C-alpha cells in the first residue's frame, strides 16, 4: 500500500512522525561508536546511567544509555575526558521524541592505540608541510604583552608568571584560564587562542600545562587545535612539559619549550643578562675606540717624522737647485749646439761658394750669353753656332757684364 502523501490537509500526528522516525533509526542495527566522555550521570541506586559522548574532532555529541551494572563491571572507573569505544543500538523514544544509543559494551581506548593515532596524525600533518621550519614565526626579542593559556590556579601559570617577572619585571600578561584536559579542553583552548590572536597588543602566546599522563594530554594532540595554531598570526609557544611522548602541539608551534618555566625563559629575556651584555659591549667598544685612536696617533707621528714634513721647504729648495742646474746644462748644450751648427753652415757656405759661378768668375772665367733680337731672354752660348757673326753678346765677369758683338767664329781643332 502506497504511503499517504503528506500535505497540510493530511498532516501527520506527532505519534505517527515519531513512529516513522523510530522505525528508520532501528534499521541501523547495532554499531560501534568511538568518542570522548564529557558528562557521566550515575548513581549506585540507579538502574540506568546516562553518558554524553562527544566527537573530539567536531562539535557533535550523542546521549548514551546503559545499565549501571555495566559501568560497575568495567576494570577502571570512567571519568570525563576518557576515550572509549561503545557498542550499542540506536534507540528513539516515541513518547518524548528523544534519541539515545542503548549501550551494552564499553571499552576504554588503550594508551598504545592513542599513541598510534597521535603518530598517524603527526605523519599526516607533516606530509601537509605544517611542520616546515619556514612556517615558524619568529618571536619578538622583547614582548610587551604575552598571552598565556593555561589551567586556572595551575602550577604552570605560577611558574610562567614568576619566572617571566623575575627576568623582566615590566612584561605584561593576558591570561586566559581554560580546561587543560577532558572534553572541554580543545574548544576552550581554541577559543582562547583566537581571542589572544585577535588582540593586537599580544606579541606572543604561550600554551602551558605542567605535564600529565598520555590521556590527560590528548587535547594537545587533537587535529582541530593543531590547525588553529597554524592559522594563528601571532607566534605560539608550546609548553606542555611532557617527555618523551610529546604532543603534536610541540611540532606545529613556532617554538617548543620543555616546561612552562623553560617557556618563560625562552620568551622573556633576562634583564640582568642584557644589562651585563650591554656593559660588555660598551667596554669592548671603548677598548676598540681607544685602540683605534692609539693606532691613528702612531700613524700620524710616523707621518710627522718624515723629512718632507719635518722641513717642507728643503724639498722645494732641492728641486729648485736641481731645476737651476738643469737650466744651466740645457743652456750650455744649446750654445754648443749653436756654435757647432754655425761652423757647419760656414763650411757649407764656403763649399757652395767654391763650387758656385761667382767663384769661377773670380778666377778669370766669364759667362757669354747671346741676346736674341726678338727681345727674349738671353741664352748661354755653349756652341759657336749659337752666336754667328754680328750677334749681340753679353759677357758676364766677376764684377759685372760687358756688351759685345760677335765678329767671327772659329771652330775648335
UniProtKB/Swiss-Prot annotation:
GO biological process: DNA catabolic process
GO molecular function, one term: exodeoxyribonuclease VII activity
Enzyme category, top tier: hydrolase
Function of the molecule: Bidirectionally degrades single-stranded DNA into large acid-insoluble oligonucleotides, which are then degraded further into small acid-soluble oligonucleotides.
Keywords: Cytoplasm, Exonuclease, Hydrolase, Nuclease
Enzyme Commission numbers on file: 3.1.11.6
InterPro entries reported in the protein's UniProt record: Exonuc_VII_L (IPR003753), Exonuc_VII_lsu_C (IPR020579), OB-fold_nuc-bd_dom (IPR025824)
Residues forming coiled coils: none
Name the record gives this protein: Exodeoxyribonuclease 7 large subunit
Similarity comment: family membership: Belongs to the XseA family.
Catalytic activity: Exonucleolytic cleavage in either 5'- to 3'- or 3'- to 5'-direction to yield nucleoside 5'-phosphates
Organism: Corynebacterium diphtheriae (strain ATCC 700971 / NCTC 13129 / Biotype gravis)
Gene name of the record: xseA
Localization: Cytoplasm
HAMAP family to which the protein is assigned, alphabetical: Exonuc_7_L
CDD domains noted in UniProt: ExoVII_LU_OBF
Keyword Ligase assigned: no
Pfam families to which the protein is assigned, alphabetical: Exonuc_VII_L, tRNA_anti_2
Assembly behavior: Heterooligomer composed of large and small subunits.
Tree of life domain: Bacteria
GO cellular component, one term: exodeoxyribonuclease VII complex
Main subcellular location: cytoplasm
Amino acid at each position: 500500500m502506497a504511503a499517504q502523501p503528506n500535505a497540510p490537509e493530511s498532516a501527520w500526528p506527532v505519534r505517527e512522525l515519531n513512529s516513522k522516525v523510530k522505525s528508520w533509526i532501528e534499521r541501523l542495527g547495532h554499531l560501534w561508536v568511538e568518542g570522548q566522555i564529557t558528562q557521566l550521570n550515575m548513581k549506585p541506586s540507579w538502574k540506568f546511567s546516562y553518558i554524553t559522548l562527544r566527537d573530539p574532532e567536531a562539535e557533535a555529541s550523542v546521549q548514551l544509555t546503559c545499565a549501571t551494572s555495566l559501568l560497575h563491571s568495567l576494570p577502571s572507573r570512567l571519568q570525563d575526558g576518557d576515550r572509549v569505544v561503545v557498542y550499542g543500538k540506536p534507540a528513539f523514544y516515541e513518547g518524548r521524541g528523544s534519541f539515545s544509543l542503548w549501550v551494552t559494551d564499553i571499552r576504554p581506548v588503550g594508551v598504545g592505540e592513542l599513541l598510534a593515532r597521535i603518530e598517524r596524525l603527526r605523519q599526516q600533518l607533516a606530509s601537509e608541510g605544517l611542520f616546515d621550519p619556514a612556517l615558524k614565526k619568529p618571536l619578538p626579542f622583547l614582548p610587551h604583552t604575552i598571552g598565556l593559556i593555561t589551567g586556572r590556579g595551575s602550577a604552570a601559570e605560577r611558574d610562567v608568571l614568576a619566572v617571566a617577572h623575575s627576568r623582566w619585571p615590566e612584561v605584561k600578561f593576558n591570561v586566559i584560564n581554560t580546561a587543560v584536559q577532558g572534553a572541554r579542553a580543545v574548544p576552550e583552548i581554541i577559543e582562547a587562542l583566537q581571542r589572544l590572536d585577535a588582540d593586537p597588543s599580544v606579541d606572543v602566546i604561550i600554551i602551558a600545562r605542567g605535564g600529565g599522563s598520555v590521556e590527560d594530554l590528548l587535547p594537545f594532540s587533537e587535529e582541530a587545535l593543531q590547525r588553529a595554531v597554524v592559522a594563528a598570526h601571532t607566534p605560539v609557544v608550546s609548553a606542555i612539559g611532557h617527555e618523551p611522548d610529546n604532543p603534536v602541539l610541540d611540532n606545529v608551534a613556532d617554538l617548543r619549550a620543555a616546561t612552562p618555566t623553560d617557556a618563560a625563559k625562552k620568551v622573556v629575556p633576562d634583564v640582568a643578562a642584557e644589562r651585563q651584555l650591554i656593559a660588555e659591549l660598551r667596554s669592548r667598544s671603548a677598548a676598540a675606540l681607544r685602540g683605534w685612536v692609539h693606532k691613528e696617533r702612531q700613524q700620524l707621528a710616523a707621518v710627522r717624522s718624515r723629512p718632507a714634513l719635518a722641513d717642507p721647504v728643503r724639498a722645494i729648495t732641492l728641486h729648485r737647485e736641481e731645476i737651476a742646474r738643469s737650466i744651466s746644462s740645457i743652456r750650455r748644450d744649446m750654445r754648443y749646439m749653436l756654435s757647432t751648427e754655425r761652423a757647419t753652415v760656414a763650411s757649407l757656405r764656403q763649399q757652395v761658394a767654391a763650387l758656385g759661378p761667382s767663384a769661377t768668375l773670380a778666377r778669370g772665367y766669364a759667362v757669354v750669353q747671346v741676346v736674341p733680337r726678338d727681345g727674349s731672354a738671353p741664352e748661354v752660348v755653349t756652341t759657336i753656332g749659337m752666336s754667328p757673326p754680328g750677334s749681340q753678346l753679353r759677357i758676364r765677369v766677376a764684377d759685372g757684364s760687358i756688351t759685345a758683338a760677335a765678329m767671327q767664329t772659329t771652330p775648335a781643332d
